[in-house]
Amino acid sequence: MKTKIPDAVLAAEVSRRGLVKTTAIGGLAMASSALTLPFSRIAHAVDSALPAKSDEKVIWSACTVNCGSRCPLRMHVVDGEIKYVETDDNTGDDNYDGLHQVRACLRGRSMRRRVYNPDRLKYPMKRVGARGEGKFERISWEEAYDIIATNMQRLIKEYGNESIYLNYGTGTLGGTMTRSWPPGNTLVARLMNCCGGYLNHYGDYSSAQIAEGLNYTYGGWADGNSPSDIENSKLVVLFGNNPGETRMSGGGVTYYLEQARQKSNARMIIIDPRYTDTGAGREDEWIPIRPGTDAALVNGLAYVMITENLVDQAFLDKYCVGYDEKTLPASAPKNGHYKAYILGEGPDGVAKTPEWASQITGVPADKIIKLAREIGSTKPAFISQGWGPQRHANGEIATRAISMLAILTGNVGINGGNSGAREGSYSLPFVRMPTLENPIQTSISMFMWTDAIERGPEMTALRDGVRGKDKLDVPIKMIWNYAGNCLINQHSEINRTHEILQDDKKCELIVVIDCHMTSSAKYADILLPDCTASEQMDFALDASCGNMSYVIFNDQVIKPRFECKTIYEMTSELAKRLGVEQQFTEGRTQEEWMRHLYAQSREAIPELPTFEEFRKQGIFKKRDPQGHHVAYKAFREDPQANPLTTPSGKIEIYSQALADIAATWELPEGDVIDPLPIYTPGFESYQDPLNKQYPLQLTGFHYKSRVHSTYGNVDVLKAACRQEMWINPLDAQKRGINNGDKVRIFNDRGEVHIEAKVTPRMMPGVVALGEGAWYDPDTKRVDKGGCINVLTTQRPSPLAKGNPSHTNLVQVEKV
């Protein structure tokens, strides 16, 4: 049977940058094309809204997962069952300058298949086999509550509240009542705070290194201009920034990126080891680069800019610390400034010429020179980095280096420019569920919880990044794992984690709360079935939303399936058994809490309609009154009146705080913390001697068919976007690998068997796996699901103690 292609598609004139806007029905090609279109520019020309049947209800819901977008869903319900799903096709229009529609991507539109998935958890269960075997027996809710409450009280009495840990989970990140991260904003945290607190964590698997690195540059979380501001840009440079797959919906960045470029006609340059869907013919240039070498490229660019007088000296003198000797702190060593480092006048004596950078990055020297001149002479320029470059062993320094391009050229704090960080956005002060204060001030890196189980009392502030005290007193004895797959699937070095969790004398109780039998759920001692977003009422807040912020009324669409309960019901019942019910609930049901929070939100946002009006309306939108969000605008306009939160109040190219840390912390060989944004290869780089045994760099990427591991069990998405290992034809030919061949990817940490995708869209010497595929081991622990974390390392990055998920050396062979 042949698929008939609509005449509108056949008649469309397809050009390189016009590909997307001339594709009226992008979804038709979605399953068969190598490049899935993340949005459709004229999709509103086709009326997708079918007339509702007389017995049909249309109820607003939302996709609340951790992609960087939040999208409304309109559920068509007949006799208590979801029949099909639409998105925002009746509020606003496709007008970029107005309150545009927020259309869900292929993931959100498949929500019905998540709700009715055969993997759904149906009732409470307790483990009867070894952890990881997935052997459980059904128990009642009362028994589950009693087991949890009794054992938690025992562990607190024996080890203290510091032994209770809330694991990282972002499965319901967009919710208000149901929010699953950060841990301090969850209902589990509220429960624990009523019971004496818990061991907290800092950082996150998405952005640990950039959050820490740019904190020492700008102070706090590094802000960025909204992508809508690209309408004022002349040039867009994206380092490892791939919104076309990560934030691809109408609520995300891709829409703004392309709409704004239609106004400004800005050139777009993508720097990435992999040719991503953000390009897909819309980019003007793709520059492939070796993973982990972004800082070396920036240093080569800076050399050209400095020697050819393309830097904004006035900006550097007024707003920055440490560019040259004029602004170098007195505490710094002679020639300890950035300019000296780049020109080879610093301690290493090496000039960071384009030729030097080319040897490291794989980018030709003449291309580096050309790019430096273009960036240095084109203003305003939107220079941005995604969170791929920072997810490396040298990620903190790399983020500081990339931001230097925006700093050197004076593009910070102006329309059309950016800080060098990822894009920012306008946000509304909507009130979320209060979770009280944690009496325990101790925290660890979110990435080092397995170490805290294995060697907790040995972990110190100077060696392991423990915060709040000099060292941990006790190991982790209980884990709450709510709406997250980081217990196994999303945490690095799965085989090591498996060994640690298998011993239930170490961590004595693991409680998993989830909707599906995930890889992590199989390691639970007590497994509680959660409601999906479609089975309860909540508010969903936007995330990467450009210059139009919004809130979605996520109504209850159907009754909870099987014996599933909401997280509020579960924690309220546990609070009753733990003797803190009144403190926890304050006498309110979930809906009463929502009405209470909404009333508070209306005080902060007077334009909000009444609760009942909002329930019918489904989504509330508001444009940024300033037009576009411009990061550090106030600082740029008056740095004296609006200083940054760095120690100097300025942009710190040289950081004395980092110099102090470098002098006092205990670091393993190869780890580097430096006051300047230098290049350091880090461990398992392409320069590592280990590459003789494992000659290929393995990097990950966020795949369009999943949000991390969420939606990873939806059949149609798996069929449309197969899990494959991407490999360049040159590397494949050396190994006798053809497209579609089964290959083994392996290193000392594990082995994965998966099909190969042979494509020139990969940098030679580099292979890639989409992260989030569900771990599926055989009896020899060889993974058949394509889970990259079988191969990643639990060695943390130096400063943030974050996950270096893209720093891996492997070998690949045909099976």
Which residues fall in each region the model found?
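Long, contiguous, secondary-structure-rich segments that constitute the structural scaffold
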Residues: 567-617, 709-711, 715-726, 730-815
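A glycine-rich phosphate-binding loop feature that marks nucleotide/adenosyl-phosphate handling sites
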Residues: 169-170, 318-321, 375, 418-428, ...
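Phosphate/diphosphate-binding loops
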Residues: 508-509, 556-575
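Extended redox/cofactor-interaction regions of prokaryotic respiratory oxidoreductases
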Residues: 2-7, 183-271, 296, 406-523, ...
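N-terminal export/assembly segments and adjacent metallocofactor-ligating motifs
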Residues: 2-310, 336, 355, 461, ...
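Short beta-alpha connecting loops at secondary-structure transitions
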Residues: 283-289, 549-560
